[in-house]
Regions:
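Acidic-glycine-rich active-site phosphate/pyrophosphate-binding loop
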Residues: 62-70, 115-126
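Glycine-rich phosphate-binding loops at beta-strand->alpha-helix junctions
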Residues: 102-120
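Short hydrophobic/aromatic-enriched beta-strand-loop microsegments
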Residues: 2-6, 126-132
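Conserved ATP-utilizing enzyme core subdomain
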Residues: 2-87, 91, 154, 158, ...
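Phosphate/pyrophosphate-binding loops at sites that engage ATP/ADP/AMP, CoA/4′-phosphopantetheine
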Residues: 94-102
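Glycine-rich phosphate-binding/hydrolytic loop that grips phosphoryl groups
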Residues: 88, 132-168
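Catalytic-loop motifs flanking and including active-site residues across diverse enzymes
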Residues: 8-13, 86, 116, 138-141, ...
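A structural micro-motif
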Residues: 22, 102, 125-128
Length: 168
């Protein structure tokens, strides 16, 4: 497989940030100020999705079903601690499901979370998490869909079962 959903990032972090009264955790500063809730982290990491072989895919409904109930059980903990635990969960999930050496291009809104990127680099000894220019980060999905459209226009396959897990 060439691509799959490792886990969640901004959907989870933004949901928690809204509890703090902000739309997102700018640069990861709220999460950085918290402490890890070990029991919560263990439960998040033991979710069966992480044991599935790629390709695999996650949607928002998965977050509601699998993660929100775990977070609800620790609602009495400060939001900073829940966010810190979420960042650690995301970073560990990414590192566990990524190549162990080389460079990995980081795109999407999570690339602007400096604390998440810091944790990725601290957890992965032989991997460099590379951040492209902000235009590339912001435009990733538009670029991808434009490329898929071009392939379709040229009459070439634009969906590969090795990437999506489709049967044909």
């Amino acid at each position: 497989p060439n691509a799959w959903d490792i886990g969640v990032c901004n959907n989870l972090l933004n949901m928690l940030a809204r509890e703090k009264g902000v739309e997102y955790d700018a640069e990861g500063s709220i999460a950085k100020s918290g402490k890890i809730i070990d029991d919560l982290l263990d439960k998040m990491l033991s979710i069966s999705y992480h044991k599935l072989p790629p390709p695999k895919s996650i949607g928002v409904e998965w977050i509601h079903k699998e993660l929100y109930p775990l977070l609800d059980k620790v609602a009495d903990h400060p939001i900073e601690d829940r966010m810190r635990t979420a960042v650690e969960y995301i970073a560990i999930s990414i590192v566990n499901d990524s190549p162990k050496t080389g460079k990995i291009l980081v795109t999407g809104g999570g690339a602007f979370n400096h604390f998440l990127i810091q944790r990725l680099n601290e957890l992965a000894d032989e991997v460099e998490f590379y951040l492209p220019e902000s235009d590339v980060i912001n435009g990733k999905e538009a670029f991808a869909f434009a490329f898929l459209g071009l392939l379709r226009w040229l009459g070439k396959p634009n969906v590969l079962k090795s990437t999506t897990g489709a049967s044909k």
